[in-house]
């Protein structure tokens, strides 16, 4: 989920309850995480996680990854299969390879704040729909990159330094509380975003289920279409695609838990 934590998964974990064993994978060594080149991050983490799961004696697993965690889950599944571990189910929730380079930090700050559950409007950001329109307009001019000042013309976003200060202060709760941890968390997030821009690797030999929030995400134009195209190419097996309520930043909850807990009817795939 970009932060290297399980924070966004908490509503889903509560909804799934205690009827099954659950294991969460998170970043515990920030320096080691940041030292991995972004273009190799997902594959490297996938190999490390697969090795750890195999070493722990697991020979059959279900995997779920959200946001950038979906890309890591994909690489973990590949490495597990190579080690003889059966991946019963690979579930991908609102995850994407960003198809352009993000040079405008304003979009990173918006996504960081939204991932933390902060009030983006109170921080000065426009509505997600307006932000998405501006992103699409900018990419129409330069499809491979979002320029450094692409969003500067939006109300409240001209002063990047002030915007960054507001977001980082809100992330720690006060001007000076936990500033080191807060700044490290932001660096982790930006590194994860850069990793999400890396070229797509070879496909996974198995099947997967993709869960797409109906409200989408302003980071990726034509969100549902983009995700479907990407993930169909990422798996050689079947790719079941299912819509869940909410937007990218709030789709992990009871509705998703119910979808995960029941067999998917064949007609739900497209």
Report residues per predicted region.
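A hydrolase-biased, glycine/serine/histidine/acidic-enriched motif that marks catalytic-domain neighborhoods
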Residues: 1-270
């Amino acid at each position: 989920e970009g932060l290297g934590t399980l924070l966004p998964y908490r509503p889903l974990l509560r909804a799934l309850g205690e009827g099954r064993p659950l294991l969460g994978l998170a970043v515990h060594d920030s320096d080691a995480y940041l030292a991995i080149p972004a273009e190799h991050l997902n594959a490297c983490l996938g190999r490390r996680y697969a090795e750890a799961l195999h070493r722990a004696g697991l020979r059959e697993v279900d995997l779920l990854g959200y946001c950038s965690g979906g890309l890591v889950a994909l690489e973990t599944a590949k490495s597990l299969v190579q080690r003889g571990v059966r991946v019963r189910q690979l579930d991908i929730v609102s995850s994407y390879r960003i198809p352009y380079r993000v040079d405008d930090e304003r979009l990173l700050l918006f996504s960081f704040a939204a991932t933390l559950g902060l009030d983006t409007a109170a921080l000065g950001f426009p509505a997600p729909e307006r932000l998405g329109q501006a992103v699409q307009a900018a990419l129409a001019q330069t499809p491979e990159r979002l320029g450094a000042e692409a969003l500067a013309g939006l109300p409240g976003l001209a002063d990047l330094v002030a915007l960054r200060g507001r977001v980082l202060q809100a992330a720690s709760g006060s001007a000076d509380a936990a500033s080191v941890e807060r700044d490290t968390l932001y660096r982790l997030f930006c590194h994860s975003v850069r990793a999400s821009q890396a070229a797509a690797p070879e496909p996974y030999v198995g099947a997967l289920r993709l869960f797409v929030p109906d409200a989408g995400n302003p980071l990726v134009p034509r969100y549902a279409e983009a995700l479907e195209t990407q993930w169909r190419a990422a798996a050689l097996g079947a790719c079941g695609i299912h819509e869940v309520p909410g937007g990218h930043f709030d789709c992990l909850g009871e509705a998703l838990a119910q979808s995960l807990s029941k067999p998917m009817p064949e007609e739900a795939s497209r």
